[in-house]
Amino acid sequence: MELTRENYNETAKELLTFLQNSPSCFHAVKNVVDMLTAAGFTEVKEEESWKLEAGGRYFVTRNQSSVIAFKVPGKDFKGFQIIASHSDSPTFKIKENPEMEAAHCIKLNVEKYGGMICAPWFDRPLSIAGRLVVSEGSRLVSKLVNVDRDLVMIPNLAIHMNRQVNDGYAYNAQKDMLPVFGSLEAKGTFMSLIAEAAGVKEEDILGHDLFLYNRQPGTIWGADETFLSCGRLDDLQCAFSSVKAVIEGENSSSISVAAIFDNEEVGSGTKQGADSTFLKDVLERINDSLGRTREQYLMAVASSFMISADNAHAVHPNHADVADPTNRPAINEGIVIKYNANQKYTTDAVSAAVFKALCKKVQVPVQTFTNRSDIAGGSTLGNISNAHVSLNTVDIGLPQFAMHSPYETAGVKDTCYFIKAATEFFNSCIVAEGNGNYSLGE
């Protein structure tokens, strides 16, 4: 299918709606589950026995913040074809007993989650979303909550009192970045407000995972309307695209898998993160439920392939010098393959070649990224999950500006590019032949 401006704009608007409805990782996974359910996927639970059938579509969640969706072509599958992304983004987590009185105001005690850009969080309407655990008789029930209005703000100190603010000021998370909740009249009302938003009684709330989020809606902008900006593009742009692709793709030889992990922004070392057994557990249970042997599982893993999808840095128009001199991704110019000699990214010659061949087949443009040799970069899902399920992996992402800002910018075209390439990935039968050789069939 040839992509058109109409395709780009329609998909961009759909993505922005998804982002708008996903103010926390819990809401993002809930929206993914809704997409999967509407497409005929059936939930299986880790606490229950799995009875998978040929032709079945399934998903499983962990902690309400990670989800793995998969399709079963039949018992005699050759391998797993996996796209991994993540549901979380840098933000602030509300601490226990958060209310603090200061200067005729009530502010909230929060702590930073992930490696954020601090400055853009100031002077803009924010709100709170996340998860509550509520007592219902003898049961404890998790409920999502979103205070869907402008609720708090982190005000800047006037330049007259902070002359260094434009000269590399170092923000103190405990002092500078606590959001104002209300006047003194709001004292003691935080939990009752949260309870009201969730439709529960305050006294029934026994636990909470609550986060700040930017209230500014996403938008498509630019003279030619080719940019889109919103919160949480990293990495919900890739997560959204992978779910669209696993729904659309059809494969008669391999298990198609879309895995969305939590806690990538804080190292992935949780039960629901990429550095957990979640993916390994799911793949093994698929194999076992279909009556296959342990050796057949290991053979399938050896013939599997994973795309680790986490957004990439585009060359910044005001800071072009910080990009590598020969690998310079641009927004709206295609999917970015990420390389790192020290294996912060898993891409090697073999995995890059497989991905390039898939993209070439459907005429999706590809770019390359590596850090300048004198600038350290980050890492992502691929090398972490490979410690538990070792398989050939390529690290890719969609190019963007302002990564880890509460309002990031990406391209209108690039979401379509990834959906198209990811769908082709799930349509293809990628088989390892050994010694770095692969066949890419239908």
Language model: regions and residue ranges:
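N-terminal hydrophobic/helix-forming segments and targeting peptides
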Residues: 1-442
